[in-house]
Amino acid sequence: MEYILHVDDSVKCIFCDKKQYVLKETQHAMVMLNLFPYNPGHLMVAPKRHVANLEDLTDEELKEIMELTQKSVKVLKEIANPDGFNIGINIGRVAGAGFEGHIHIHIVPRWNGDTNFMPIIGETKVIPEGIEKTFKKLKPYFE
């Protein structure tokens, strides 16, 4: 909820301005850890070019975004052994996009009994693994 309720106006775009926790870059796309993860291993895949609309992506961008999405699922299956995934795109603030100006795909690993996903009422949750630890665990698999 923090990312929806309190947008940091000093950061124009996390994908363009704040490229920390980037696991891999290709010519047209990148995959990075979400700074406000729903679950450990929550990744985001985005085009490098600042573009808001799905229909404005080039064929090359679409191809590389899907290849990185596929790679991300394979890596997460290997190291985190999730029971499933939520994979999706939030287009527009009303749809939950925290950064609506730069389209991106969320890849969220899920486990059976996972009741800690996107809590709305309490607006808090415990993430069992810190982002630094998750980054260090995932980074070698993307090299």
Task: Kindly give the residue locations of the regions a language model identified.
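Active-site microenvironments that recognize anionic phosphate/pyrophosphate groups
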Residues: 1-41, 45-46
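C-terminal helix-cap and adjacent tail motif
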Residues: 2-8, 109-143
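Short, charged/polar surface micro-motifs in flexible loops or helix N-caps
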Residues: 28, 37-38, 51, 70, ...
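Histidine-centered active-site/metal-ligand motif
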Residues: 42, 50, 102-106
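Short histidine-centered catalytic/ligand-binding loop motif
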Residues: 44-66, 121-127
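Long, well-ordered alpha-helical scaffolding segments within enzyme catalytic domains
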Residues: 58-82, 132-134, 139
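A short glycine-rich, hydrophobically flanked beta-strand micro-motif that places a catalytic Asp/Glu
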Residues: 80-93
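Histidine-centered divalent-metal-coordination microenvironment in nucleic-acid enzymes
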Residues: 86, 96-116
